[in-house]
């Protein structure tokens, strides 16, 4: 058997494994956080690709700088409050998805055996990347207001010293929670006091339809590295993400990216930039995304509460892509329900997939992003036939 220690540490993603199952046409998937196919801006992407190949074929098809396509870096810098900085793009590294950004910054800032703190439950991809890097994980409790910063402070007071604290501050994956304004201020103060880096993984921040967004962590402390992506607001198949970081951190990540893949696809970088920078495109497209996902979220939550309200609690999302449902039967194990659910034609992700130290057996992550209303109804009907009645 060919298997390194890194492979053993990382393990296989439960969600990626489920995607093989959900490709079967008879399965209604509430598992993956995939954009709704109807929202993919194929015409705009086609225009951008054609323009890149016509206007700059050499730049689109030749090797490029590891840091990324400079116009895209400038655009990202502007979106992150650096528009007035003439060298704002120096803070930006374009990566092959934000997943690569997390992998690079972990290797750049944490040696194997170092400590990274994160919420429990946590995003599966982050768990894979961190475990593959050989770091130790400090599991911090979380609730409806995000990471429990007081619990982190207690750990720090005992002498624990994480190099990184990883958060999905806006519409966490899997819980859907948003880190409250008060906790953001407290977390930033802890970073300044103890010297750790905050990694704010932010693929969902633009998908808000209710309420005001709290102040970004990057505006509260310079010890913030923000990860972003074109996957949720444009198309995941383009595999373009980015990190916005202090220049010395960006340079360290660039050195590691050189040995990883030289640079992210020059063509897809141009496609992303030309599409997102097209006047009026992003504003209009975000309206479409928010309207679509709000309607689908409300539909799924309503169906679950109507048909399964005696068996689970279902929060109302303000944005993002996920519902973190909780089974009322405290002895239930959602992992044991997955196979019967798939056999019935519906897929979800059990809470155990997101566990750092806890298994979250009564939790289920349900995505409303991909399926239409009729499919969501069918999925709920099938779940109702699998989850035991009280």
Q: What residues fall within each predicted segment?
A:
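N-terminal small-domain helix-loop-helix segment of the aminotransferase-like
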Residues: 8-97, 104, 278, 347, ...
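Conserved PLP cofactor-binding pocket of PLP-dependent enzymes
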Residues: 27, 203, 342-365
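Conserved core of the PLP fold type I
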Residues: 59-194, 205-223, 293, 322
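Active-site PLP attachment segment
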Residues: 206, 219-252, 264-267
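Structural signature of PLP-dependent enzymes
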Residues: 253-258, 278-302, 330
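Conserved glycine-rich beta-strand-loop-beta hairpin in the small C-terminal domain of fold type I
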Residues: 291-301, 313-326
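Short, conserved charged micro-motifs
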Residues: 331-337, 374-378
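PLP-dependent enzyme catalytic core of the Aspartate aminotransferase-like
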Residues: 343, 358-390
């Amino acid at each position: 058997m060919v298997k390194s220690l890194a492979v053993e540490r990382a393990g296989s993603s439960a969600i990626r494994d489920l995607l093989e199952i959900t490709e079967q046409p008879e399965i209604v998937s509430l598992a993956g956080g995939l954009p709704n196919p109807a929202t993919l801006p194929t015409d705009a992407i086609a225009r951008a690709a054609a323009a890149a190949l016509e206007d700059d074929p050499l730049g689109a098809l030749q090797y490029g700088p590891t840091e990324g396509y400079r116009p895209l870096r400038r655009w990202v810098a502007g979106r992150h409050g650096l528009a007035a900085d003439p060298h704002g793009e120096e803070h930006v590294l374009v990566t092959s998805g934000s997943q690569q950004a997390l992998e690079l910054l972990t290797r750049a800032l944490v040696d194997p055996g170092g400590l990274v703190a994160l919420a429990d439950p946590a995003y599966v991809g982050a768990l894979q990347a961190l475990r593959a890097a050989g770091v130790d994980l400090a599991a911090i409790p979380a609730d409806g207001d995000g990471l429990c910063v007081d619990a982190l402070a207690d750990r720090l007071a005992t002498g624990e010293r994480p190099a990184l604290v990883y958060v999905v501050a806006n519409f966490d994956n899997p819980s859907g929670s948003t880190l409250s304004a008060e906790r953001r201020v407290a977390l930033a103060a802890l970073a300044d006091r103890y010297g750790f880096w905050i990694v704010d993984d932010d693929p969902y921040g633009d998908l808000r339809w209710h309420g005001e967004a709290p102040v970004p962590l990057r505006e509260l402390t310079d010890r913030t590295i923000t990860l972003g992506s074109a996957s949720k607001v444009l198309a995941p198949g383009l595999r373009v993400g980015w990190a916005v970081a202090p220049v010395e951190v960006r340079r360290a990540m660039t050195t590691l990216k050189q040995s990883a893949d030289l640079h992210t696809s020059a063509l897809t970088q141009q496609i992303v930039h030309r599409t997102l920078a097209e006047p009026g495109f992003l504003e209009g497209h975000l309206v479409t995304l928010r309207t679509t996902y709000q309607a689908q979220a409300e539909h799924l939550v309503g169906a679950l509460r109507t048909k399964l309200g005696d068996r689970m609690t279902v929060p109302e999302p303000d944005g993002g892509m996920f519902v973190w449902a909780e089974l009322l039967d405290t002895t239930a194990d959602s992992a044991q329900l997955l196979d019967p659910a798939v056999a019935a034609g519906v897929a979800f992700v059990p809470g155990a997939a997101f566990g750092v130290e806890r298994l979250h057996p009564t939790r289920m992550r349900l995505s409303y992003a991909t399926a239409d209303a009729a499919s969501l109804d069918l999925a709920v009907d099938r779940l109702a036939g699998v989850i035991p009645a009280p």
